Design a protein with these regions (language model features):
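Conserved P-loop
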Residues: 36-130
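Phosphate-binding/switch region of NTP-binding enzymes
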Residues: 192-258
């Protein structure tokens, strides 16, 4: 697709990746990031948060698996120190815990432009009412996928949900599609740029249907490089609307300073 000159971009925090996607993630859109364990999914999200906070944007990290302490330690080891942004209010971390907790969240007074199914989901999850959004821990057992909206303040500009796949378990394919579509549309209506990290197990379990809901998709792999015989990390960008992209696989590494892209390798690996 031809790139749009009017599409604003949000830098990814990974310089060479920005060059591959027209300057960054499309602003106000949802991007799906999938991959098996060990491919660096969380690190991609940390790069985005560090860059966006450095640019003065209000950011939210919704963590469904790792603790804030572990995430902050991981970011610090890569030179992406996030603590100052927590202190000055540019970053907030919402941890979704498997504990009992009180009702949480915030208002989302938007129904214009949504279909009946989406409006039903919004009302079912009480997104049309006002709630607190300052609670630290949340009950993943009773939390709905669309409840993610409730955790995001009105002034947020960039959100990373890591791992949205955790919230997909227990849903059938139609339920997941309806809820994920609604979540993505509500956040896009608020002009929030979102990266949805999704583990490969949940991605396959939901028949890869999340690809159809988001504006873009980045897939991470660990495969044997036939030229070197070594197991290496690759990424592909099969979809990025309003952006001119290459379908070649891109070799990358995780270094002491985070993600480093090493160049395109064409279609040299079998990702099946």
């Amino acid at each position: 697709m031809e790139p749009s000159d009017r599409m604003e971009r949000v830098p990814t925090g990974i310089e060479n990746l920005d060059k591959k996607i027209g300057g960054g993630y499309p602003q106000g859109k949802g991007i799906l990031l999938t991959g098996v364990p060990g491919t660096g999914k969380t690190i991609f999200g940390l790069h985005l948060l560090y860059q966006s906070c450095s640019d003065g944007k209000k950011c939210v990290l919704i963590a469904t698996e790792e603790s804030p302490e572990d995430l902050l330690e991981q970011a610090g080891m890569l030179g992406l120190k996030l603590e100052p942004f927590l202190e000055n209010g540019l970053l907030s971390i919402k941890q979704v815990l498997e504990i009992r907790a009180g009702a949480v969240a915030r208002a989302a007074h938007i129904v214009d432009g949504f279909n009946n199914t989406e409006i039903d989901l919004i009302e079912e999850c009480e997104l049309d009412r006002s709630f607190r959004h300052d609670q630290v821990g949340f009950n993943i057992g009773t939390m709905d996928l669309v409840d993610v909206v409730k955790l995001i303040p009105d002034d947020a500009k960039v959100v990373v949900v890591d791992n949205v796949g955790v919230l997909a378990f227990g849903l059938d394919i139609k339920q997941f599609r309806d809820k994920f579509d609604t979540l993505n549309r509500v956040l896009s209506a608020k002009q929030i740029t979102v990266v949805y990290v999704m583990d490969d197990a949940a991605y396959q379990l939901t028949h890869q249907i999340a690809d159809y809901s988001t504006h873009g998709a980045i897939k991470l792999f660990v495969k044997e490089n036939p030229y070197t015989g070594k197991m290496e990390r690759f990424l592909s960008i099969p979809k990025m609307r309003s952006t001119s992209i290459s379908l070649d696989f891109i070799l990358f590494d995780i270094t002491a300073t985070g993600i480093q892209l090493k160049g395109s390798k064409g279609k040299l690996i079998d990702v099946g």
